[in-house]
């Protein structure tokens, strides 16, 4: 690990792939110092692949069994997984204390745990979505029954959840959501807020009658509350409710959980009317020029995948949500990743009728509107 840490970024700034160049540097070092072949091969692999785990966890949906199976195939065995996990966590935390938070800790741990399971049972027995859903249900139900709920209390709510919910939520998230929704059943909308381990992040869950403007209004409101969203899970229930889950990083003047819930509740009265707040670009970001790049591709389930790379800045997600609302585009999932001063976000989209955005003119108009908004040419 020490050697991988010393060499993993040694080739930055030399042009080309710094991971491959660093691995080549280490290979020469290992030969000249007579390191054992097996150890040298392991460290060389770690240097070459040191971004693999972080990239997979932040850019892809690790609740998807295919993603886990593919990652397990690249790692190949438990030894490589263990070393890569340690190096990845150390690399993120060592780059800047602000980059390491409770959410990234959980994200890396989830990827590690799922991959370890695949490697234990064997790559010839890949993860199966149906098995994961069943296990998640059973684990969550057992915890709820321990807390005093009966199966008859829980099942009516769970029957309204889409099957994807039991694939994308962890058992502890389902327990938390279920307890909160049932305790607030008399309310028109249920809003839950909890601190994550480490107390630098919050998880927020909103269940509310589905309608236009919810995501845009919630993102704008969270921004006004000085909460930076870095993960959003957006689902729709079978009985017409939006199920929106956000992981946010606390700001310097973040209000308490009760005030956050009250503010979000007020915003839900007319979410489509809430416009993004205006922000001055921090001086530290003015010297970074990241060209905005927007690409569209087809996604499973009659959806469109939008990949967006741009300079990170305050209010970015709120602005994106507002443009999507104006163009009558629905958001079904969002994965937000920040690498230094660059944001790399992925959104799963559809039109208002829940179909993919297939018209080239519509995609061109959406791309142009986003470019105008994100590059300061707001209409």
Which ranges hold each PLM region?
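Divalent metal-dependent catalytic cores for phosphoryl transfer on phosphate-bearing substrates
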Residues: 1-125
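Regulatory modules associated with amino-acid/nitrogen control
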Residues: 66-379
């Amino acid at each position: 690990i020490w050697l991988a840490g010393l060499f993993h970024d040694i080739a930055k700034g030399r042009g080309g792939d710094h991971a491959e160049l660093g691995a080549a540097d280490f290979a020469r070092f290992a030969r000249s110092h007579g390191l054992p072949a097996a150890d040298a091969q392991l460290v060389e692999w770690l240097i070459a692949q040191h971004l693999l785990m972080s990239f997979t966890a932040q850019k892809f949906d690790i609740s998807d069994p295919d993603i886990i199976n593919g990652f397990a195939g690249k790692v190949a065995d438990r030894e490589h997984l263990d070393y890569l996990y340690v190096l990845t966590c150390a690399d993120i935390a060592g780059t800047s204390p602000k980059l390491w938070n409770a959410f990234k800790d959980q994200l890396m741990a989830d990827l590690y745990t799922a991959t370890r399971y695949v490697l234990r049972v064997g790559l010839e027995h890949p993860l199966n979505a149906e098995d994961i859903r069943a296990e998640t249900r059973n684990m969550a139900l057992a915890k709820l029954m321990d807390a005093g709920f009966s199966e008859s209390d829980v099942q009516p709510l769970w029957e309204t959840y889409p099957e994807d919910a039991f694939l994308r939520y962890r058992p502890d998230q389902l327990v938390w959501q279920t307890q909160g929704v049932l305790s607030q059943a008399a309310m028109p909308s249920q809003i839950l807020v909890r601190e994550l381990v480490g107390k630098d992040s919050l998880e927020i869950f909103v269940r509310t009658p589905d309608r236009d403007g919810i995501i845009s209004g919630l993102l704008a409101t969270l921004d006004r509350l000085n909460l930076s969203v870095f993960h959003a899970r957006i689902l729709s229930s079978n009985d017409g409710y939006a199920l929106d889950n956000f992981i946010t990083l606390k700001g310097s003047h973040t209000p308490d959980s009760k005030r956050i819930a009250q503010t979000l509740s007020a915003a839900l009265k007319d979410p489509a009317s809430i416009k993004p707040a205006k922000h001055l670009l921090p001086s530290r970001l003015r010297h970074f020029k990241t060209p905005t790049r927007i690409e569209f591709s087809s996604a499973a389930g009659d959806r469109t995948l939008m990949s967006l790379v741009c300079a990170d800045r305050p209010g970015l997600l709120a602005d994106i949500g507002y443009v999507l609302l104006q163009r009558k585009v629905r958001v079904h999932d969002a994965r937000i990743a920040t690498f230094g001063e660059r944001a790399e976000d992925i959104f799963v989209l559809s039109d208002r009728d829940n179909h993919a955005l297939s018209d080239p003119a519509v995609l061109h108009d959406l791309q142009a509107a986003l470019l105008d908004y994100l590059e300061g040419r707001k209409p």
